[in-house]
């Protein structure tokens, strides 16, 4: 019989409790009280029945609805991202107890795909969109711990993460550098200039400027941070 989602998440956090930090005060998670995480300053975070966890100060982003994540899930299940994810997999160090975090995981399909090859490594998928994390829990229960969190305030201790995956989403290099362990790896996937060009050409037929995309600023910023 499959373990309940809420129990699986509690057990995962208990096993890796030393990796997490309070998003309010950055203190250590001191205890697991039933289905709640409690930091040393008594801030409390409850695991819900879906097994997900809200680990950020503000309310979750509600700009993205469930329909968007349903379509993204369907695209992922078609195998569209698999060649890219195979390349990502080849870059991940296979070290047990080295936490891997997918920052901006959406509905979780990329990390769920990777989990099939990383069965002994702790995985966390995080996104600021509540609907994305709920979809991840619905489709990919027990593949990873799914949390609502903000990349500007990562709920992890300093030097606690072995690998960060940042796929087609914004970055916060200050936070990335804080949580990466010595020798840790950041894998950032940046769209190419022709990314979604067919859609842009259809959506912006009367605006040629918006039909084009440049990743030069993103690439340059990455090079500045990691010369």
Question: What are the roles of these predicted feature ranges?
Answer:
Residues 210-225:
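Short alpha-helix
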Residues 185-214:
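Conserved class I S-adenosyl-L-methionine
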Residues 10, 62-83, 87:
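Class I SAM-dependent methyltransferase Rossmann-like catalytic core
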């Amino acid at each position: 019989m499959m373990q309940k989602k809420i129990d699986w998440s509690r057990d995962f956090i208990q096993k890796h409790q030393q990796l997490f930090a309070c998003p309010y005060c950055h203190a250590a998670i001191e205890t697991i009280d039933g289905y709640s995480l409690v930091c040393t300053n008594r801030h409390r975070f409850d695991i819900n029945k879906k097994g997900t966890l809200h680990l950020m100060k503000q309310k979750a982003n509600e700009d993205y609805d469930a329909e968007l994540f349903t379509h993204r899930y369907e695209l992922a299940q078609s195998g569209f991202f698999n060649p890219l994810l195979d390349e990502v997999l080849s870059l991940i160090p296979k070290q047990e107890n080295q936490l891997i975090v997918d920052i901006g995981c959406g509905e979780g399909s990329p990390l769920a795909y990777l989990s099939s090859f990383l069965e002994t490594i702790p995985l966390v998928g995080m996104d600021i969109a509540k609907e994305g994390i709920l979809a991840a829990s619905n489709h990919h229960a027990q593949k990873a711990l799914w949390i609502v969190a903000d990349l500007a305030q990562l709920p992890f201790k300093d030097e606690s993460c072995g690998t960060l995956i940042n796929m087609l989403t914004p970055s916060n290099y200050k936070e990335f550098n804080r949580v990466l362990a010595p020798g840790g790896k950041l894998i950032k996937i940046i769209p190419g200039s022709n990314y979604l060009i067919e859609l842009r050409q259809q959506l912006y037929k009367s605006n040629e400027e918006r039909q084009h995309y440049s990743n030069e600023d993103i690439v340059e910023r990455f090079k500045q941070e990691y010369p």
